[in-house]
A protein has these predicted regions:
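Active-site helix-to-loop segments that bind/position phosphate- or nucleotide-bearing substrates
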Residues: 1-32
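Internal, well-folded beta-alpha domain core
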Residues: 30-184, 189-196
Length: 196
């Protein structure tokens, strides 16, 4: 029923950046973006989708619900992960190179599986922000905070037109601050000390 409705004319089409409604996109809050913000996003932001592959923010899509481990019998029983991997990796690498050769990776680990990630990391510079909180005297990753922080950082990048990973260190939100001692050139660690 869901898949039949997907092609129905009544199913609304929206720009990808406005179509998604999860925690990351709520914190990103593109509804208040200016035309300039959308223009910068269109050039510098890419969204990953099990249904559509690699999207630019203004690509028009229909709402859908789909998991990456769906098997495609018509295509030799491969999953969506393997289907997209061979189709997206080259395009993704070229996109990153044409935008300066540096990727700020704010995608979930699951979405990285849409690409040959080892190849991506070997051909372009990948910087991955991590978000941790102190809990019971240890650093912990709390999924909801990670998702919210990814959305907020994406907003920070787009609103401030950030192009240099060094500028990401200035990100601060809800107690999350950059921690130089836990970071390196591949990962930028942000810590919230609320549970110390």
């Amino acid at each position: 029923k869901r898949y039949q409705a997907f092609h129905a004319e009544a199913t609304p089409e929206l720009p990808a950046l406005l179509a998604y409604t999860g925690i990351v996109f709520k914190r990103l809050n593109p509804k208040d973006f200016s035309a300039e913000d959308f223009g910068y996003a269109q050039e510098h932001l890419r969204l990953t989708s099990f249904c559509y592959g690699l999207l630019r923010p203004l690509d028009v899509i229909r709402a859908y619900r789909l998991e990456g481990d769906v098997v495609l019998p018509e295509l030799g029983n491969q999953t969506l992960f393997s289907y997209w991997r061979s189709r997206l990796t080259d395009t993704f690498i070229e996109d990153i190179r044409s935008a300066g050769g540096i990727l700020c990776n704010l995608a979930s680990d699951e979405m990285k599986s849409l690409f040959d990630w080892k190849r991506v990391e070997s051909e372009v510079r990948v910087v991955t922000p991590e978000f941790h909180v102190w809990k019971n005297g240890k650093l912990a990753t709390i999924v909801v905070y990670t998702k919210m922080s990814r959305g907020e950082m994406t907003r920070f990048i787009l609103k401030n037109k950030i192009g240099n990973p060094e500028e990401l260190k200035g990100f601060s939100w809800e107690g999350f601050e950059f921690d130089e001692s836990l970071s390196d050139e591949k990962k930028l660690v942000f810590i919230n000390g609320m549970g110390e």
